[in-house]
Amino acid sequence: MSEENNLVAVVRTEFGKGAARRARRDGQVPTVLYGHGEDPRHLNVPARDFARILRAQGTNAILTLDIEGTEQVALTKSVVVHPIRSYIEHADLLVIKKGEKVTIDVHVVVVGDAAAGTMVAQDASTISIEADALHIPEQIEVSVEGLEIGTQILASQLELPAGSVLQADADTLIVNVVAAPTEADLEEGAEAPAADEAAEEA
């Protein structure tokens, strides 16, 4: 585990919205650590360092927490971000151990260019897989290079990293290659609202 993922976590003794606001004002993120039948632990972690790790690894980041001198490895399970100011409001962390399998949602990234005259519609941006807790892929790539109109890629056709197992429905549609709209289609789409407005005014 890289030292860049280390965070010093402070056990919280105050709770409620007021305490959470004070923690954030002091540059901390309120978190809850749970799992393995242990009682949930309420912690604060440094906001700047936590945000840096999430930017580098995504929302499934693995953390090494220093909790009062004891090291604990954890998976970032969920992150709540303020919708306007974009700071991290809260996070849930899951206790993990070496060799353990976890079920997580991983981002699906489309790469390559489909055939000329086509448009790629991505129906699923994430996919649920089971993976080693310490070897979670940052993303799963799906190539559309040269694909023709009518081609579909299902979850069962994704190339998963070694040791990972698909948990989503095998028939989940990931990518659908369709005909790109023509200029006539675009013009017709632009004219329709104008025609509707004219009809309403008549």
From Swiss-Prot:
Role played: This is one of the proteins that binds to the 5S RNA in the ribosome where it forms part of the central protuberance.
Xref: CDD domains: Ribosomal_L25_TL5_CTC
UniProtKB keywords: Ribonucleoprotein, Ribosomal protein, RNA-binding, rRNA-binding
Family: Belongs to the bacterial ribosomal protein bL25 family. CTC subfamily.
Xref: HAMAP family: Ribosomal_bL25_CTC (MF_01334)
Complex formation: Part of the 50S ribosomal subunit; part of the 5S rRNA/L5/L18/L25 subcomplex. Contacts the 5S rRNA. Binds to the 5S rRNA independently of L5 and L18.
Gene Ontology BP terms: translation
Protein name, as recorded: Large ribosomal subunit protein bL25
UniProt keyword Nucleotide-binding, yes or no: no
One GO CC term, this protein: cytosolic large ribosomal subunit
PANTHER family given in the database record: RIBOSOMAL PROTEIN L25/GLN-TRNA SYNTHETASE, ANTI-CODON-BINDING DOMAIN-CONTAINING PROTEIN, RIBOSOMAL PROTEIN L25_GLN-TRNA SYNTHETASE, ANTI-CODON-BINDING DOMAIN-CONTAINING PROTEIN
Natural source organism: Rhodococcus erythropolis (strain PR4 / NBRC 100887)
Gene Ontology MF, one: 5S rRNA binding
SUPFAM superfamilies the record matches: Ribosomal protein L25-like (SSF50715)
